[in-house]
Amino acid sequence: MTFPEYLISKDILPGIKVDKGLEDFGSGEKLTLGLDGLSERLAKYYALGARFAKWRAVITPGNGIPTDDCILANAENLAKYALKCQQTNLVPIVEPEVLMDGSHTIDDSFEITSRTLNTVFDQLENHKVNLQGIILKPNMVLSGYNCSYQADITEVAEKTVNCLSAHVPAEVPGIAFLSGGQSDEDATMHLNEMNKYETDWNLTFSYGRALQQPALKAWSGKSENVEKAQGVFIERAKANSLATAAGL
């Protein structure tokens, strides 16, 4: 039994990251690569058991950036990737991430995220991507790491839901937030607060560090800590599961 087959036997659908990383785009900006040979790779991954794919675009706030050109170039690549996925019977996770790095305010984040989502969905529609067959993986609307004013949980939830309501079509079935470097507690509580709102979509999580970091810290590479680390991971997973129903 292959690893994908084992996952499927446990009702876990496997997926794969298919972009090839970033290249410089102008001053301080990045463009995600990976369209070359993508259709052939997707067909191979589907045959191996993958049922979804992921492509991450990076949008960097800063002095005079992001530019419209960079947002558009990344949105076009996201749309081309998403269409190729659907043509191969894979569900595309569409991930336009506005980074937390920097001193930008939460209002700056709202404006940049709004511009980004508008452009992404314009390109998805231009490329005839079926919006009912994607999952959106966006950032939350947050203060930059180095901003002197850090928005609280209530403000983050309100601004994020307002931004999504204005710019994400109702046909999109699900939104799975990235944690983007938030603490594990903040990522969970922001999700919990957002799920107190009535929205058109299922709001859930697609966290890396916010799920894994506490378990990795508990483990610390020591075999005697494995059971403890597993318990920590289950605890974080349960908390986020409850947050999807505003249950905390």
What are these regions (language model features)?
Residues 1-48, 59-61, 149, 153-159, ...:
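Alpha/beta catalytic barrel-like cores
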Residues 25-27, 57-70, 98-104, 145:
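Glycine-rich, proline-tolerant flexible connector loops at the mouths of alpha/beta enzymes
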Residues 28-43, 66-81, 114-115:
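Glycine-rich anion/phosphate-binding loops
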Residues 51-53:
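Short acidic/polar active-site loop segments enriched in Thr and Asp
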Residues 100, 104-171:
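Catalytic core of soluble alpha/beta enzymes
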